Amino acid sequence: MGIVFEGVADGGSPVAVKVVTTELSQDEVFVRRFQREVAAAQKIQHPHVVPVLDAGESGGLPYLVQELIPGGSLHERIESAGQLDLATTVRLLAGPAEGIDALHGSGLVHRDIKPANILLDGDRAYVTDFGLAKDSQASNLTRPGQALGSLDYMAPEQIRGEDVSAATDIYALGCVIHECLTGTPPFGGRPSMRVLFAHLQEAPPDISEARPDVNAATAKAINRALEKEPEDRPASAAAYVKSVLKAATA
């Protein structure tokens, strides 16, 4: 949300500067979401969440400054590799899963967990981009029935515009694991309306069919996050990733 520039802080360290464009700065709802992103990110102090270093307004344009993570995104890693092995997937996502749980512990739901919002520095990974984050204690900036998020990673309740919860982010994390292992989200490669319908109605694909090196127990553990009902998904993101690792090493 906005344009991101690379900059240099007063002390000489590289930073990422996210600026709302002139056009979007006239959109009151967008600006309020941007301000909410700042407030949400500033609430979280976690080693796997990209911190906000500064925020303000310049020339009428709101901005925020974050630590620059130099290794690109998980999306770029998947695009380059095609697929990741299970060990790499779990290693990369274990930290962000803890960061996601930290968000939830602060009353936040990210609502846009996807590979592009997981940044890498070697094998260390970070959650970023809180532009759609929902504070359970704050007023809602969306209309009833309005869905916000990225289509390939949206939980059924999110598509329906219903209340979101920690389980919504866990669903998205399950979609991310699918993409890491197969190169595509579970219902990817279809027209938009078919993707929506699949999230709402279809059982997720069995990863072991596309990846014979992933055993049936692990495939089942991965798909627990993609249950249609939020209460049927794992209780936390970190516990979910650990359950996948446990199934793989049993």
Regions found by a protein language model. Give the residues of each.
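Activation-segment/catalytic-loop signature of the eukaryotic protein kinase fold
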Residues: 55
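Activation segment signature within eukaryotic-like protein kinase domains
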Residues: 92-93
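Conserved short submotifs of the Hanks-type protein kinase catalytic core
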Residues: 59-73, 77
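AlphaC helix of the eukaryotic protein kinase fold
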Residues: 21-43
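Protein kinase catalytic-loop region centered on the HRD/HxD motif
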Residues: 96-108
